[in-house]
């Protein structure tokens, strides 16, 4: 492994992808372009928000002392890909093989799992919504986040309420594969570095999402590190924009933008720590303007798929119905 400076990341840990065509802009909190990009639902890295400065001391030792005795969701995988799946849907789908295992453990048990990973090829990823089970010091740190700035952004762009703050602690090399969320996201980096690849919503047909009723709803079926072009030919036309975020950076990930997040190799301990600020989207306007935006088109497609599944009483029959409707009528 290459030698690299403390607090930096190993450039050799960056995978090369042919689909990357541009860099996400990095802007100051004082730059008017920052807010124009957010207004236009375009990604931007904001370098000086001080959004989570009070959490800069959140290393593993501090968190172990102060997170409390609550339980945390920790995922384990034999490879480095942590593809999201809906646990309730997975239980109902007998043929579905979960891409990772979910555990409900204390933070001390998570640290023990981290130590075990040093001796095995297993990877672990803690993904837990911050709640009232945390200790008082964490609460104090949380209250000192730059809420004034995010609240002003929420009001300025007409977003809905804050739905959750997700704490993410991952090993170097961990990947959250390509997916999109139905919420606005300020992704705040606390420790370590992450590489973020984003694809715009108008590339929906290039990224082959699972059906809405599938346990991996909103996830792409394409492994962009090793794409199967025979199965997913339109992925050749996909193009991503990327950024590497470090401590103090905040990446705005607009709703319905596809993204893949990769934890880069860094100094010991080899973990990255991040917090999501997820906000519900802007309510639908009273008057719909045409043409629809790419985000609105994705929303329409999701709703149509859901309604058809409900009407048919079987989500498995949706594809057959759509093919019957379209083939020979709209494919000539």
Q: What is each PLM-predicted segment?
A:
Residues 1-250, 258-332:
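N-terminal accessory scaffold of Fe(II)-dependent oxygenases
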């Amino acid at each position: 492994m290459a030698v690299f400076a403390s607090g930096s990341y190993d450039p050799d840990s960056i995978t090369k992808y042919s689909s990357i065509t541009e860099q996400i802009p990095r802007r100051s909190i004082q730059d008017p372009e920052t807010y124009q990009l957010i207004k236009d639902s375009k990604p931007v890295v904001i370098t000086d928000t001080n959004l989570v400065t009070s959490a800069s001391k959140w290393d593993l030792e501090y968190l172990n002392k102060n997170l409390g005795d609550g339980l945390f969701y920790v995922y384990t995988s034999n490879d480095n890909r942590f593809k999201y799946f809906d646990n309730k849907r997975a239980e109902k789908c007998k043929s579905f093989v979960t891409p990772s295992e979910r555990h409900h453990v204390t933070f001390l048990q998570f640290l023990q799992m981290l130590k075990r990973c040093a001796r095995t090829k297993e990877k672990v990823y803690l993904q837990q919504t911050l709640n009232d089970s945390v200790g008082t010091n964490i609460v104090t740190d949380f209250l000192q986040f730059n809420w004034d700035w995010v609240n002003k952004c929420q009001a300025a762009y007409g977003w809905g309420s804050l739905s959750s703050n997700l704490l993410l602690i991952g090993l170097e090399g961990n990947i959250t594969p390509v997916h999109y969320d139905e919420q606005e996201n300020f992704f705040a980096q606390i420790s370590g570095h992450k590489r973020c690849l984003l694809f715009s919503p108008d590339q929906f047909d290039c990224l082959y999402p699972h059906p809405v009723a599938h346990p991996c709803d909103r996830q792409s079926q394409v492994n962009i590190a090793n794409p199967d072009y025979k199965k997913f030919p339109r992925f050749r036309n996909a193009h991503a924009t990327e950024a590497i975020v470090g401590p103090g950076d905040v990446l705005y990930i607009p709703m319905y933008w596809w993204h893949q997040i990769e934890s880069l190799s860094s100094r010991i301990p080899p973990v990255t720590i991040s917090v999501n600020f997820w906000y519900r989207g802007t309510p639908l306007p009273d008057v719909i303007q045409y043409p629809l935006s790419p985000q609105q088109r994705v929303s329409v497609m999701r709703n149509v798929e859901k309604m058809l599944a409900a009407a048919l009483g079987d989500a498995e029959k949706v594809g057959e119905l759509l093919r019957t409707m379209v083939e020979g009528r709209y494919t000539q």
